[in-house]
Amino acid sequence: MKILCITIGLYFALLPALAQADFRSLEALAAPSADPWSYWQTSDESNVRTIDFSVWGNILRRFVAPSQYGINLFKYADVAANDRAAIDGLVSSLAALPIRSYNRAQQMAYWINLYNVLTVKVVLDNGPVKTIRDIDISPGFFSDGPWGKKLLKIEGQGVTLNDIEHRILRPFWKDPRIHYALNCASLGCPNLGTRAYEASNLDEQLDIAAYTFINHPRGARLENGEMIVSSIYDWFTLDFGGDEAGVIAHLRKYAGPDLIAALDKHGRLDRAEYNWNLNGSF
């Protein structure tokens, strides 16, 4: 009873702050923060070696299919045993790399591709499922999904999906476009692309990913007098300028003419939403 009273008291204590947070939700309070894992901050900018992502690129070309709704779907049901073996082999080869000895551009491409490979692998290994959130392999009584599970070891360190996103990519690169590159196997997530990310043209690829998502209805849209945005901007507002005005400025940077006009006319964000249904079927 005491714990329940404290929880209810905390909820009501937070109401004034939430009211000032515009479109932000209670769910945003539980979103992981950028918490740097200093071990992975090391790089060697003199190293010109490149990482081969051709196996992943081949998987993407064969199994990612654009839908009529502008959302890329993954053909999980079509992945044969030899394809799964190729994915497993790719994960093993990426895990064996001394990634801290590479330059930062190679590292960024590495972590993005590894995150997406692992996400596909974890769905294949635990499917069929209707949503990735049903893959309850993370430790902790209140945890759901696979994000807290140590999925592999890199340079002797156990690494989770949460580590890659929130302890490596977000804190060390501080680039909001990262959110458009990482795919969480859900319809509400930015598209899983048909090409692997490459250090040689990362900026172009990230810009395209940002433009594609923001100008799709699941990124931002004006509907029935409401400006509805992806929950990504609710959960990670700090990455997009820190407040509602910052999110709007970020959206305008990549928005097409119609969305810019809608943002300028409406002037605010009303609510956020997200579709956790799986981005494909078995």
Where do the language-model regions lie?
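Sec/Tat signal peptide C-region and signal peptidase I cleavage site
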Residues: 17-20
